[in-house]
A protein has these predicted regions:
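Polar, glycine-rich mid-to-C-terminal structural blocks
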Residues: 1-33, 193, 197-199
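Intrinsically disordered, low-complexity segments enriched in small/polar residues
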Residues: 3-6, 36, 68, 186, ...
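Disordered, acidic Ser/Thr/Pro-rich linker "stalks" and the adjacent N-terminal cap
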Residues: 232-248
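Substrate-binding clefts and catalytic carboxylate motifs of secreted carbohydrate-active enzymes
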Residues: 15, 19-187
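Intrinsically disordered, low-complexity Pro/Gly/Ser/Thr-rich segments with frequent PxxP/GP/PP motifs
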Residues: 189-231
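Residues that act as N-cap/strand-start positions at coil-to-secondary-structure junctions
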Residues: 161-163, 204, 234
């Protein structure tokens, strides 16, 4: 048992890193079985407009706090959630755009939350319980389906990660693994990775595939993506020019 929390959405790498302490937990215990963990989860726009008065739609104001997106639910880290939307998917241009991009953060964070434990299955990690499945009040935090029973991105992220045989990428180690939570051994599975650049073109140098056997109730390594980690300085060996004069 490793305590409760955290309850705010983090970037995927967080869930694969040596695990931070939860409330009443011991950081030395690592992943273990986390009895309560969750993220802020903004609902879809269709649900949002049912409970939020139109004059309070945008930008975020004190009325949002009454639906737990502010100081009333500070441990859901709403400011970090908003920053994640802007960093990952661009600054929202209005409430509809905000709710749409929020679903992508919901998917990403909740998928990674489960995958972080699957990545270390039985190597200190035994499971998690999500706080929480559904909100009993129109809310913007801690739900996989909302007050109106509409599915959020958190549901789809968790569903993807929890498929019985699941392939995952560890963004910290760049390892690709197969998690098999069934009672049946799987043989001759094909694991393949393709990496695409910002133009949508495949970067063939990173394409890999492997035939993998996946024992029941375990996670196995397929391969590691060979990203270049040695050169962090993108300007290294590039010609530069400088001047100390007013006119350059």
């Amino acid at each position: 048992m490793t305590g409760s929390g955290p309850w705010g959405a983090f970037e995927p790498r967080f869930y694969f890193t040596k695990y931070p302490d939860g409330l009443e937990g011991d950081p030395a215990r690592g992943w273990g079985f986390r009895t309560e963990i969750g993220t802020a989860v903004v609902p879809t726009f269709e649900s949002f407009k049912k409970f939020m008065p139109k004059e309070n739609w945008w930008p975020r104001d004190e009325m949002w706090n009454k639906h737990y997106f502010g100081q009333n639910a500070f441990n859901a880290a709403p400011d970090r959630y908003d920053a994640s939307i802007t960093k990952g998917f661009g600054k929202p241009e209005g409430i509809e755009d905000y709710c749409r991009k929020a679903q992508l953060v919901n998917i990403e964070s909740n998928k990674a939350m489960y995958e972080g434990w699957l990545d270390r299955m039985w190597e200190d990690a035994s499971g998690i319980m999500t706080w929480m499945g559904q909100s009993a009040y129109p809310s913007m935090v801690w739900q996989t389906y909302d007050y109106y029973y509409d599915l959020t991105g958190a549901f789809w992220g968790a569903k993807s990660a929890c498929e019985p045989v699941h392939i995952l990428w560890n963004p910290v180690t760049d390892g690709v693994k197969i998690a098999n939570t069934t009672a049946r051994d799987m043989e001759g599975l094909t694991a393949e990775v393709k990496v695409y650049n910002m133009d949508g073109k495949s970067v063939e140098a990173y394409t890999q595939s492997a035939i993998v056997n996946s024992p029941s109730n375990s996670t196995v390594q397929c391969f590691t993506i060979g990203f270049n980690k040695e050169r962090k300085n993108l300007s290294l060996n590039k010609p530069t020019f400088a001047s100390s004069t007013t006119y350059g």
